[in-house]
From Swiss-Prot:
Span of the signal peptide: none
Listed name of the protein: Heat-inducible transcription repressor HrcA
Keyword Transcription regulation: yes
GO biological process: negative regulation of DNA-templated transcription
Family affiliation: Belongs to the HrcA family.
One of the Pfam families matching this protein, by short name: HrcA
Keywords, sorted A to Z: Repressor, Stress response, Transcription, Transcription regulation
GO terms of molecular function: DNA binding
Higher taxonomy: Bacteria, Bacillati, Bacillota, Bacilli, Bacillales
Known role: Negative regulator of class I heat shock genes (grpE-dnaK-dnaJ and groELS operons). Prevents heat-shock induction of these operons.
InterPro entries: GAF-like_dom_sf, HrcA, HrcA_C, WH-like_DNA-bd_sf, WH_DNA-bd_sf, WHTH_transcript_rep_HrcA_IDD
Gene expressing this chain: hrcA
C-alpha cells in the first residue's frame, strides 16, 4: 500500500514524463509546486517506488521513468477526468449531428478526427453489416458483358462489385430484375437475404424474367457480399512522431502491423463492453509491447456493434484519450439508437 506522499510523487513523475518524454529526477520534482518535501525525502521515496517496481532507471539518465506496473497503477487509481475545450466538444458533436444517418461515414470520420485530437493512431471497427437492412439494389451496365452491382443498406453502407452479364440478358430483363429485388428485399436484414431470395424472389423472377437461368447467375454475383465489419484508421504514421519510435528498426514491426490491418481487426473484434486499457506487454502482439491500446465499444440497445480504439506509446495521455473515447462512444451509441428506432 503506497503512502499519500508516494502516491503524489508517482503521479507527478508519470504526469511529467507523459508531457516531456524525459526521465524525471529529484531536482525536477523539487521544483514542482505540489511537491513540498525536501530533496532527500524525494530521493528516498523514489528509491522505494523503484524497489516496488513502479518506476525504473534508464541507461542514459539519472532520472526515472514509469514502469508498466506504474502506468497500470496510474490508470487504475490516479487518473482524473480531463476537460475538453469547447471547440473540441463542438467538433465532435457536429460530426454526429451531420452524418449519423450514415454510420460507416461517421466511423471513418471518427478515426480521422480522433487521430487529429490525440496525435496518436485511431482505429474504428465499423458496425457489423449483418445487422444492416437492405435499402436499395442497383445494377448498372458497363458494357455488353459487365455491369456494376451496388447494394445500399439502411446505415449508409455501400457495397459495389463488377459482375458478368450473360449476353442472353437484355436491358429489359435487367430492369425487371432490379425492380423485383427492390420490391421484395427492401428492409430485409442482410443475414436473411439468402432465405428471402430462395423462398420468394426466385419464383417471381421465373415468372417475369425471360432468361431465368442467366438472371440467377447475375443474382448470385450481386449478393456475394461479405458481412464482416470494416476497419478504419486515422493517423497511421502518427507513431513516427513520438520520441519512443524515432528508431525505425524498433517501430518497423508495428508499422507493418498497422499497414496490414488484419491483426487489429481480430484484436478489436474480441473487445468487451466498456473502456479497456492494455499497456505494453498486456497487448497480445509483440509488435505492441511499447504501446498502449485504449478501446471503447459502441452499441444499439444491448447489441455491441463496433469498437473505437487509440494506439499510442505507453507514455500516453491516458486521461485525455479516455475522455475523448467516452464522448465519442456516447454520441455514436445515441446516434445509432436514434437511427435504428426511426426505421
Amino acid at each position: 500500500m503506497l503512502t499519500e506522499r508516494q502516491l503524489l510523487i508517482l503521479q507527478t513523475i508519470i504526469d511529467d514524463f507523459i508531457g516531456s518524454a524525459q526521465p524525471v529526477g529529484s531536482r525536477t520534482l523539487a521544483k514542482k509546486d505540489e511537491i513540498t518535501f525536501s530533496s532527500a525525502t524525494i530521493r528516498n521515496e523514489m528509491a522505494d517506488l523503484e524497489e516496488l517496481g513502479f518506476i525504473e532507471k534508464t541507461h542514459s539518465s539519472s532520472g526515472r521513468i514509469p514502469s508498466e506496473k506504474g502506468y497500470r497503477f496510474y490508470v487504475d487509481h490516479l487518473l482524473a477526468p480531463q476537460r475538453l475545450s469547447a471547440e473540441e466538444i463542438v467538433q465532435i458533436k457536429d460530426l454526429f449531428a451531420e452524418r449519423i444517418f450514415e454510420a460507416e461515414k461517421v466511423a471513418q470520420q471518427s478515426a480521422q478526427i480522433l487521430s487529429e485530437l490525440t496525435n496518436y493512431t485511431a482505429i474504428v471497427l465499423g458496425p457489423k453489416l449483418s445487422t444492416n437492412k437492405l435499402k436499395n439494389v442497383q445494377i448498372i451496365p458497363l458494357g455488353r458483358k459487365t455491369a456494376v452491382a451496388i447494394i445500399v443498406t439502411d446505415t449508409g453502407h455501400v457495397q459495389s462489385k463488377t459482375i458478368t452479364v450473360p449476353e442472353s440478358v437484355d436491358l429489359s430483363d435487367l430492369e425487371k430484375m432490379v425492380n423485383i429485388l427492390n420490391e421484395k428485399l427492401f428492409g430485409v436484414p442482410m443475414v436473411e437475404l439468402h432465405n428471402k431470395i430462395v423462398k420468394e424472389v426466385v419464383t417471381v423472377l421465373h415468372k417475369y424474367v425471360h432468361n431465368y437461368d442467366s438472371a440467377m447467375k447475375i443474382l448470385d454475383g450481386t449478393f456475394q457480399v461479405p458481412l464482416s465489419e470494416k476497419i478504419y484508421f486515422g493517423g497511421k504514421a502518427n507513431m513516427l512522431a513520438q520520441p519512443e519510435f524515432h528508431d525505425i528498426q524498433k517501430v518497423r514491426s508495428l508499422l507493418e502491423m498497422i499497414d496490414n490491418e488484419a491483426e487489429f481487426y481480430d484484436i478489436l473484434r474480441k473487445k468487451q463492453v466498456g473502456i479497456q486499457v492494455n499497456i505494453g506487454r498486456e497487448n497480445s502482439s509483440m509488435a505492441m509491447e511499447d504501446c498502449s491500446l485504449i478501446s471503447a465499444t459502441y452499441s444499439v440497445g444491448e447489441e455491441q456493434l463496433g469498437t473505437i480504439a487509440i494506439l499510442g506509446p505507453t507514455r500516453m495521455h491516458y486521461a485525455r484519450v479516455i475522455t475523448l473515447l467516452q464522448l465519442f462512444t456516447k454520441h455514436f451509441t445515441e446516434g445509432l439508437n436514434g437511427l435504428y428506432k426511426s426505421k
